[in-house]
Amino acid sequence: MEESLCNLSVKDLMEAGAHFGHQTRRWNPKMKLYIFEEKNGLYIINLAKTLYQLRKALPQVCKVIKENKPILFVGTKKQAKCVIKEAAIEAGEYFVAERWLGGMLTNMTTIRNSIKTLDKIEKDLTQNSSYLTKKEIALLAKRHQKLLKNLEGIRYLRKTPGLVIVVDPGYEKIAVAEAKKLGIPVLALVDTNCDPTPIDHVIPCNDDSLKSIRLIISAIKDAIVNTKKKLGVEIVSPIKALTSDEEANSSAEENENRQEDLLAKKYDSSEAN
């Protein structure tokens, strides 16, 4: 086991508050294995097991990178979204930090159509704005912002992820269910109120504390970055536009769906909705 992948200590985890679980009345009995004790009405997580689980999981994370498969970070609750987005960008991986849209993994055709719509709107706003009225521009800008907010982190995802990393699988149960349906392994930060059964790599910890989430997600991100550096793999931001070669390949796949219409006709139906 490559313990060098993780330089954290039990003390680091404790200082981040990773040991604080939920109130005893809100626990999931299946998390009993990872609980150290009950104190003042709260369950205290066994941080030795947290560290063990993290060190056990990191080589599997690195294996996904070595297999040239993408990783998807998921964390849409307030405490997680900024951490998830920053870590994914720094690692050159993908993320969902806003609303999880049903079918993001299991119905990629629909998601790709939404991304194509986003691309078309951007093109019209940047290249064809002179043909649009102020009202049309305002409506398109509003729609663009909504689509970008939800799709930004997976916009250039072209392959099925080799791993999904989740903060709070109870909160992200749809994402977990879609990953399991496709046979994608799931690594999750799991608190004492969650069911760890569907999770392949359980990291027991306080998943409501910003410090706890940041500490553990940063350790995972660092392992990804260091593995890529050792392999000589370029770290490219997931929100960066595709290269010309990648764009050409993508265009070839989607060419049959491209059809130049009058701008008014393009968006009449969508705006009516």
Curated annotation (Swiss-Prot):
Residues covered by region (Disordered): 244-273
Compositional bias annotation for Basic and acidic residues: 255-273
Coiled-coil regions, chain positions: none
GO molecular function: structural constituent of ribosome
Gene Ontology CC entries for this record: cytosolic small ribosomal subunit
Keywords: Ribonucleoprotein, Ribosomal protein
An annotated GO BP: translation
UniProt keyword annotation of Ribonucleoprotein present: yes
Pfam family, one: Ribosomal_S2
Database matches in PANTHER family: 30S RIBOSOMAL PROTEIN S2 PROKARYOTIC AND ORGANELLAR, SMALL RIBOSOMAL SUBUNIT PROTEIN US2M
Similarity annotation: Belongs to the universal ribosomal protein uS2 family.
Protein name: Small ribosomal subunit protein uS2
Annotated organism of origin: Chlamydia felis (strain Fe/C-56) (Chlamydophila felis)
Gene encoding the protein: rpsB
